[in-house]
Structures are given as C-alpha cells and as structure tokens.
A protein has these predicted regions:
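Glycine-rich active-site/cofactor-binding loop and its immediate structural neighborhood
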Residues: 72-111, 116
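Short beta->alpha linker loops
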Residues: 32-33, 110-114, 135, 257, ...
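Short, basic, glycine/proline-bearing loop/turn elements
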Residues: 77-83, 126-132, 224-226
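Alpha/beta catalytic cores of nucleotide-metabolism and tRNA/nucleoside-modifying enzymes
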Residues: 1-46, 288-309, 313-381
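An N-cap/entry alpha-helix motif that binds or orients negatively charged groups
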Residues: 1-69, 178-235, 371-373, 379
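A gly/proline- and charged-residue-enriched helix-loop-helix capping module
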Residues: 101-122, 126-140
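Short, conserved beta-strand segments within well-ordered enzyme catalytic domains
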Residues: 49, 64-66, 75-79, 105-107, ...
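Alpha/beta enzyme core
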Residues: 83, 97, 118, 122, ...
Length: 381
C-alpha cells in the first residue's frame, strides 16, 4: 500500500498502521477508557441527514472562512497536536508547509517538537498555539511571552486536560516520550525498520517549549505522568482571565462543552471557543462535539467564533457542522495518520482530498459559499 492508494480517512489510517511501531500508532489511534466517546464522535454525524438544493448555479465555489481574525481558504484547519516528530521525522514542518500550501491554519502544541520561532520564521500561514496550563506559573509566563515574541496569531488554551485521560492502549503498549528502547521497543524498531531508521538518523527528539522545565533525566516521560505531575488542576476562570488580558489578542478556549462555560468565555473576553472532547481522549462518556454544537451556537454564536473538533473524517461532516453554525472545524487524526504515512506529501494529499470533498459536496448541496449553508439543510433522525 502506497500514498497513491489513499483515498480517504480509513486509507491513511491503514497506511499509518503499517508504517508505525504499535505503541506509536496506538497513541494516535487510541482514546480514553472504553473509547465510547471516540466512537460516538464520528457516529453522531450519521444521525444527521443533508437536504440538498438543486439548480442553484454552483460553478464557482467559495469555501473560505474567517475565524478569530484569520482568513482560511478552506473551513478546516490542522489542530495543534503533540509529539509530531515521533510520528514522522518531518513533524510540524510537514504540517505547517502543507497547511501553508492550502491556505489554512496550523498549530503548534506545548508538547510540540519544534519551537514556535522556528515554525513562524519559515511559514507564513495563520498559526495557533495550543497552551497547556502548568503548576509552575513562571513556566506559564515564559511560554506566553515566547509565543507573543514568536508572532503567534491565536492563543488556544486547552482547558480539558487538567489531568490525563485513562488511555489504556498507552498503558498496555508502554508508550513514552521519547520512544523507549525497552525490549519491546527494540522489537518494535526491528519490525518497522524504515520508521526506526528515520527516527534514529534525523534531528534528536526534543520538546523545545518545555526543554528547560521537564525533567527527562531518566530518558523518558509518559504522557499520563506529564498531565498528572505538571498540569495544574487548580486552573480557574480567574487564571484564564489574566491570560486573556496579558495576551491582548485572539484568544481561544479549546475543550468547551457546556453552554455555561461558553457564556463565561464570552464574559472574560475570549474571541473563540472550540467545542471539543479532545477526540475522546479525556472523559469517556462525554457527549460528542457535534451533538453539543447547536445549543452552544444558539447561546453565544453571535458573540464569539464557535469552532468544533473531534470526529471529523469527511467533507460532509464539515458541511454538517457549518450548517449547524460552526464557523470552522479542526481536525487532528485526519492529518496525523497522513503525516505518519508519508510526511508532507501525505498531509498535502489529506488536505487536497478533504478540499475536493468539501467542494464536491457544496455543489451537490447547491451551496456556492459557506453562507449558503444553514440548518434548513439538515434533518436529524
């Protein structure tokens, strides 16, 4: 199986599975507890049907959107994700270059494997920064100042990770960062030689945003340990309000799931919220983002940019979310599988296929622009 054989989400997933060591593939692929919310995130779209209009003259399609002051040529962006150079040695550089090519936003995580400055200097597209709030308030301040100095366009504070989700696949496989050379790790290197060769012969793994603060003296740290030991469960609305004031720019909360929290985000001056359950990786049993979208849009959609992620696999999923009132959607696994499968060419192919799906489906819906989409286009079963 090669990149040219990938025509959709499941194909990229399969190619990534073939190329990655099992612990790394399952880190991307897995979720919390029984993975019920993870499964529901995509299945929820199946409970909603599209109602197309015809004879609307749809030769020219404009799928551009503007979110938090950023003009995007397509209504889906590459959500910031951690540890990208573990999945492919080109990591964030591949994702940023591909997003730049397609005129959409990309993000760097606090657990990113390149520095904010390095990415900002090389790519001109809209950039967001996924910020994790740490117990060390000095670290938080340094990270905010570094992001501002790097010219980050959107600060995206993740608010649903005050402790780590119970990701049982990671516990079973022993996933850690950097990839641990245990007996099982050596075995995984051996059965995936090309991944191993690339991992060992390219730039040494690091976490530039955290290198001066994370103790990796024993060589590794588990994701669960990072969340439980370093992130601050005491984070509250007062802390976030201070961050919003300091940032004094586009500020987004990622991980909002309740109307009450959405209203509070408006009150403290946020310019965007991402309706997200972290791809099902945190609280299993929580509602799907798509199911929760409409009531949050109804409550605050005229006061703040409402975005959603979690479960997006198809262009039709994007259109359903936009029809409900989302301004745009974010995707993680949809490009991570492609990154793992083939680096930058993989991410470009994933974005191109998604763009074509959105364009095709807009024509079939009789919509020339995103503004033509509305709830009149939807029926729930």
């Amino acid at each position: 199986m090669r990149l040219k054989d990938c025509h959709g989400f499941s194909d990229f997933r399969e190619l990534a599975r073939r190329r990655l060591p099992s612990p790394i593939f399952n880190y991307i692929d897995g979720a919390a507890d029984d993975e019920t919310t993870y499964d529901r995130n995509t299945k929820s779209f199946e409970e909603c049907d599209l109602i197309p209009n015809v004879l609307r003259g749809v030769e020219n399609i404009d799928m551009s959107v503007t979110i938090m002051g950023q003009k995007l040529d397509m209504p889906i962006y590459c959500s910031p994700t951690a540890l990208q150079r573990v999945f492919h040695h080109s990591g964030e550089h591949a994702v940023a270059a591909a997003a730049d090519k397609f005129g959409t936003m990309f993000g760097v995580s606090s657990l990113g494997t390149v520095s904010l400055t390095e990415v900002r200097e090389q790519y001109n597209g809209p950039q967001c920064y996924q910020f994790y709030f740490h117990k060390d308030r000095g670290l938080n301040q340094v990270m905010l100042e570094n992001a501002k100095a790097a010219g980050v366009d959107v600060m995206m504070l993740t608010v649903d990770t005050i402790t780590g989700g119970n990701r049982e696949r990671d516990l079973r496989t022993g996933f850690s960062i950097p990839f641990k050379l245990s007996l099982n790790g050596i075995f995984q290197f051996g059965i995936k030689p090309m991944w191993a060769l690339n991992y060992l012969t390219h730039k040494k793994f690091s976490l530039p945003q955290l290198d001066d603060f994370v103790d990796m003296s024993d060589g590794t740290i588990s994701i669960g340990k990072y969340f439980s030991d370093m992130l601050d469960p005491c984070m509250n609305w007062g802390d976030v309000a201070k961050m919003v004031d300091f940032w004094d720019g586009q500020f987004c909360l990622k991980g909002i799931m309740s109307v009450e929290d959405a209203k509070k985000a408006v009150e403290i001056g946020c310019t965007g919220i991402v309706i997200s359950n972290h791809g099902g990786r945190q609280l299993d049993g929580s509602r799907s983002s798509f199911d929760q979208l409409s009531e949050i849009v109804d409550a605050v959609g005229d006061q703040i940019d409402v975005i959603m992620d979690s479960g997006i696999q198809r262009g039709s999923h994007v259109l359903k979310a936009l029809s409900l009132g989302a301004k745009a959607v974010g995707g993680g696994r949809f490009y991570l599988y492609a990154l793992a499968a083939a680096g930058q060419p993989g991410v470009e192919r994933a974005l191109e296929l998604m763009r074509l799906e959105i364009e095709r489906d807009m024509r079939l819906m009789g919509a020339s622009s995103i503004s033509d989409l509305s709830r009149d286009n939807l029926r729930f079963r």
